Swiss-Prot record:
Residues the record lists as binding ATP: 6-13, 32, 116
Native species: Campylobacter lari (strain RM2100 / D67 / ATCC BAA-1060)
InterPro entries, per the entry: MnmA-like, MnmA-like_C, MnmA-like_central, MnmA-like_central_sf, Rossmann-like_a/b/a_fold
This protein's name: tRNA-specific 2-thiouridylase MnmA
Catalytic activity: S-sulfanyl-L-cysteinyl-[protein] + uridine(34) in tRNA + AH2 + ATP = 2-thiouridine(34) in tRNA + L-cysteinyl-[protein] + A + AMP + diphosphate + H(+)
Lineage: Bacteria, Pseudomonadati, Campylobacterota, Epsilonproteobacteria, Campylobacterales
């Protein structure tokens, strides 16, 4: 089978390419340039070239910087500007890795696209990975349903530690097993605020109010805060921790309160992405990547919006983040919290 493998220079994509080559497939590698970090790309391309030469495969360098900027980077900036919390990895997977890269794979005559994601595909649906601690099904849940039939995730049945051990047994790949893992958001080197600083003044002090509307302090600028944050702002006379409940970007104000005020029993979704045909779901939801699953009921509207009723309350729901719905280990749908 002719397969395009997304290669980043990391251990996961390297082992993915190696395993598929050993299984007898015709492999082509592809490195994606997504953002403007010349030294970053140069180092990674050298690693990809090293692996490609070792495996005896061709590789391509695909410049997707403009697409990445329009589909991922600027939406990231604008979502924070709107006082919401973005999920750039979900957008990148849909539009770039499983979008533009898949288009490129097809243009080369490849039957499948393989990546180093920790997840599984079964009967046209995304499943959680065997390694719960590395499961990436949450970030893949915004993928176009039509893309799933072309995807292969060879590491879905492996534990991360075993991937590293496997690489360490092959002389040429030993260095990949010990290299530092990439950060969660590839274009954020330190903090997201430093990224925002390139586009706007984030240090405009504003008012902190309690949930009754009373002014209780000052803050450093609303873009420094996300829902649930409990530090970096003033609350006069407070004797217990206060958390960000709401952000008002137009007024440059944040509303704070006690932890109990973060409790949510229902919420609305937009841009729902269904992998099964349904108008209602009785399932479990994750409201952020590392959150536990919560039982819920979902009522889906014709305009791709939905109402989610939780059977147990959750804390700190952030607009702009993605909610992902599961039936045990199967991904049923996703949507963005509104």
């Amino acid at each position: 089978m002719k397969i395009l493998v997304a290669m980043s220079g990391g251990v996961d994509s390297t082992v993915t390419a190696y395993k598929l080559k050993q299984a007898g497939h015709e492999i082509i590698g592809c490195y994606m340039k997504l953002h403007g970090k010349p030294n970053y790309h140069e180092e990674n391309i050298q690693k990809v070239e090293k692996v490609a030469n070792f495996l005896g495969i061709k590789y391509h360098i695909l410049d997707l910087q403009e697409d990445f900027k329009n589909q991922v980077y600027m939406p990231f900036i604008n979502t924070y500007k709107d006082g919401k919390t973005p999920n750039p990895c979900a957008l990148c997977n849909r539009f770039i890795k499983l979008g533009k890269l898949l288009e490129f794979a097809k243009s080369l005559g490849c039957e499948k696209l393989a990546t180093g994601h920790y997840a599984r595909i079964e009967n046209g649906l995304i499943k959680t990975a065997f390694d719960d601690s590395k499961d990436q099904s949450y970030f893949l849940a915004n993928a176009d349903k039509e893309a799933l039939e072309y995807l292969i995730f060879p590491l879905g049945e492996m534990k991360k530690e075993d991937v590293k051990k496997f690489a360490s047994t092959i002389e040429v790949l030993k260095s990949f097993a010990t290299q530092k893992e990439s950060s969660e958001i590839c274009f954020v080197e330190d903090t997201y605020v430093q990224v925002l600083d390139q586009f706007m003044d984030t240090k405009i002090p504003g008012i902190v109010r309690d949930s009754s509307g009373k002014e209780v302090g000052k803050h450093e600028g609303y873009m420094h805060y996300t829902i649930g944050k409990r530090r970096g702002f003033e609350v006069r006379g407070a004797h217990e921790p206060h958390f960000v409940l709401k952000i008002d970007p137009k007024k440059n104000e944040i509303i704070v309160g006690k932890k109990e005020e973060l409790k949510i029993n229902e919420f609305d979704l937009e841009k729902i992405n269904l992998f099964i045909d349904a108008k209602e779901l009785d399932c479990e939801v994750k409201i952020r990547y590392r959150s536990r699953s919560t039982p819920c009921k979902v009522m889906i509207n014709d305009d791709k919006s939905a109402k989610v009723i939780l059977k147990e309350p959750v804390y700190g729901l952030a607009s702009g983040q993605m909610a992902v719905f599961y039936d045990k280990d199967l991904v049923l749908a996703s949507g963005f919290i509104n």
